[in-house]
Amino acid sequence: MWKGKTRGGVSGYLFFIYLIRYCGVKAAYGFLSLIVLYFIPFAPKATKSIWQYARRILKRNRIQSVGLLLNNYYRLGQILIDKVAIGNGMIDKYHFKFNHYQEFLNVLDGDQGVIMIGAHVGSWEIGTPFFNDYSKKMNVVMYDAEHQKIKEILKKNGQQQPYKIIPVNEDNLAHIFKITEALDHKEYVCFQGDRYLNADKLLTCKFMGHEAHFPIGPFLLASRMKVPVVFYFAMREAKQTYHFHFILAEQVSGSKEKRAEQLLLEQYVNALEKIIGQYPEPVSYTHLRAHETLANL
């Protein structure tokens, strides 16, 4: 189970920030290609899970699985580099495509707060420049350990966060009140719907043919608050292109057979499966969620 921390030290992130700023994006890609082998032995759990995914789910042979492993780490590194580059004003070096963008903006312009639920595929932060003034009303819910690391990186790099953070700490429920307050003020609250800290507060749903666990929080809040819900994915394509997918969730009403939060989760999983079908690589945490037991076989 994920512990709310993102791989990579602050010094490593800062190195890439300076490399991109003074040598350019292509230089960062080049350096990444030299160090991608590092991740295979030094990220053993991820390596084993990706290998099992390639062999047992995608049915790749050994040579193809090695290629997928190397390509996977390289492409994940590219996404991190892109995130830093765009955050440092290099947006003109990238191309962007959108699905249902105007419908999404219409929801944001409505008379209610909005809940946005993403996943750990692609890179949701890439979309920040397109939100413009909407960013002032965005509240990103993230675990406190990750929040502290991002704060340190931004402070050392002299940058400001374009959106607000609601840190989640297992020891108290302060984040619940902040989320409710943000929605009451017609602001937007952004979650990742595929990771959890508390194994006691989960929903179960069939995902890619396997039973998988998801955090109950985003789906319970969305169903209780009766606000619009948008599923949001920003996916990397060829030639430094990012494709934004906005899926407006249908309103749900629970019953004795199935609660409202479960119905909303099923909509989310359906959207997520379609995205993964379109973008089978790089293999992310989300791809492995339904197959997490494979690493223990």
Predicted feature locations:
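Membrane-anchoring hydrophobic helices of lipid-metabolizing enzymes
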Residues: 1-118, 151-155
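Catalytic core of membrane glycerolipid acyltransferases/transacylases, capturing the structured
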Residues: 110-170, 185, 196-201
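A cross-family acyltransferase "interaction/gating" segment
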Residues: 146-155, 195, 199-263, 267
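Conserved binding/catalytic microenvironments
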Residues: 191
